[in-house]
Every structure is written in structure tokens, then in C-alpha cells.
Design a protein with these regions (language model features):
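Bacterial N-terminal signal peptides
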Residues: 4-19
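Exported/periplasmic ABC-transporter solute-binding proteins
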Residues: 23-51, 55-58, 62-72, 79-82, ...
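Active-site phosphate-binding/coordination module
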Residues: 97
Length: 252
């Protein structure tokens, strides 16, 4: 009976303790889908270096931001743009002075078919495909960049009816990898990380779309969590910048 009471007391204490004491050794991080592979390399390095643990949730930047606004327990936000972290500051969901650019995203046109094209821009202009994949431009910064590229080339209206939209850039990549779309606009980092056939890809000139400055910020829920602050600082380290560069991102 005493043992049962002890268990009950322990559970009660866990629930009564403020979050920063109950899980002070854990940081809850929301990460844009395009940064999935890099994050999976970075997290073990962080945990080994600091002794803290990390819980990660991946998704489109727009959907993650909506979850943050609705009270999701995220403490750090790694977005695929700077718009949402700025909004988080403005709406008092994030701590001012903690926001910074951790990576500069690059867009690629990719096909799982190695023989599909040698000149990506010319291939897009021919329209010689049934389906092209892109992320939702309303919620995914890489989707917005894809839209900008097509408008720059002058093919947005012509291709609009043949575009299939992924909820995020990870789903967009899967559409192409599984041949549900012949070609797709994806993050260059995904092509770099892909373990299968590299296929055909075109690294799209960066003057074809607005810069993709991917920013991180400390959220209000992580203000008193040392693990959250440590994670953000770790992102700025030379060790992490090497990982980020390896996946095809630009770094400061």
C-alpha cells in the first residue's frame, strides 16, 4: 500500500511541477519539414554534447505556426522562412532578441528518373510531363519559392492544372520519389540526403525566387527551459554549420 501511495505521490508531483522543472532536461522543437534530415544528424550531436534530450515535430512552417498559436507545447521553432518567426515575436509567442537565420534554403527541380532531363528550365518549358509536384505555397515557403520560379520562367498559368501540391516539402518529395509525379520542386537538401537513385536534378538559380532565410526562435514556452536555450546556441556552433552545409544549405 505504501508503494502504491509513493507512485501516486510521484505522479502528482510531476503534474503539479511547472513545466520548466518537470521537463527541464528536455526541449520540444518544431522543425520545418525540409530540415528533417539535417535535424536527425544534429539532434544526436546535441544530446551527446549537452546531456539534454530533444523531442522533434516536423511539418510545414505554416501548419507548425498555427499549432504554436493554438497552444502546442513547442519551445523552439525552426521555420523555413523568417515571416513566421517574426510574426511569433510580434504576437508575443516568441522571445525578442533570440531570432536568427540558421540556414539559407535552396530550391531544386528533381525527378527520380535519371534520364528525364539535362536542362531543367528547358524541360519545364516543354511541359512534357503529366504531373509536377510542389509544396502548398500558402503554408510551405519552398512551395512559395516554386511558384515564384514558375512565374519567373513564365509557365505558372500553363502548368497550373498539372500541379499536385504536397502539404509540406517532405510529402512533395515523396510524390516524386514514388513516381506519382514525374518531376517536382523540392529542397536541394532532400536531393543531397536521398539514398536512392539521384535521378535528374537542376539546382535552380537563386535569383529566380526570393531568398529562403530559414530562421529559428525561442518560443515563450521555452523561456525558462535551459535545454531550449542550449539548443538554439548549439545551432550556431561551427560543428552544426558543417552539418547544415553538407545538406546543401547556405550558412552565415
Amino acid at each position: 500500500m505504501k508503494f502504491a501511495n509513493l507512485i501516486f505521490a510521484s505522479i502528482l508531483i510531476t503534474y503539479l511541477l511547472p513545466d520548466e522543472y518537470a521537463q527541464a532536461d528536455v526541449v520540444n522543437v518544431a522543425v520545418a519539414a525540409n530540415f528533417t534530415d539535417a535535424t536527425r544528424d544534429i539532434v544526436p550531436l546535441f544530446e551527446k554534447t549537452t546531456g539534454y534530450n530533444v523531442k522533434v515535430s516536423f511539418g510545414s512552417t505554416g501548419k507548425l505556426y498555427s499549432q504554436i498559436k493554438n497552444g502546442a507545447p513547442f519551445e523552439v521553432f525552426l521555420a523555413a522562412d523568417k515571416k513566421r518567426p517574426e510574426k511569433a515575436e510580434h504576437e508575443k509567442l516568441a522571445i525578442k532578441g533570440t531570432r536568427f537565420t540558421y540556414a539559407k534554403g535552396k530550391l531544386a527541380l528533381w525527378s527520380a528518373n535519371a534520364m528525364l532531363f539535362t536542362n531543367g528550365e528547358e524541360y519545364l518549358k516543354t511541359g512534357n510531363f503529366k504531373r509536377a509536384a510542389m509544396a502548398n505555397p500558402k503554408t510551405a515557403p519552398y512551395g512559395l519559392a516554386a511558384q515564384q520560379v514558375m512565374k519567373h520562367i513564365g509557365i505558372w498559368k500553363a502548368l497550373h492544372s498539372r500541379l499536385v501540391q504536397g502539404e509540406n516539402i517532405a510529402q512533395t518529395f515523396q510524390f516524386v520519389a514514388t513516381h506519382n509525379a514525374q518531376v517536382g520542386f523540392v529542397a536541394l537538401s532532400q536531393v543531397k540526403a536521398w539514398k536512392g537513385n539521384k535521378g535528374s536534378f537542376w539546382e535552380i538559380p537563386q535569383n529566380y525566387y526570393a531568398p529562403i532565410a530559414q530562421q529559428a526562435v525561442l518560443l515563450k514556452k521555452g523561456e525558462k527551459n535551459p535545454a531550449a536555450k542550449a539548443f538554439l546556441e548549439f545551432l550556431k556552433s561551427a560543428q552544426v554549420k558543417t552539418v547544415i552545409s553538407r545538406y546543401g544549405y547556405g550558412v552565415n
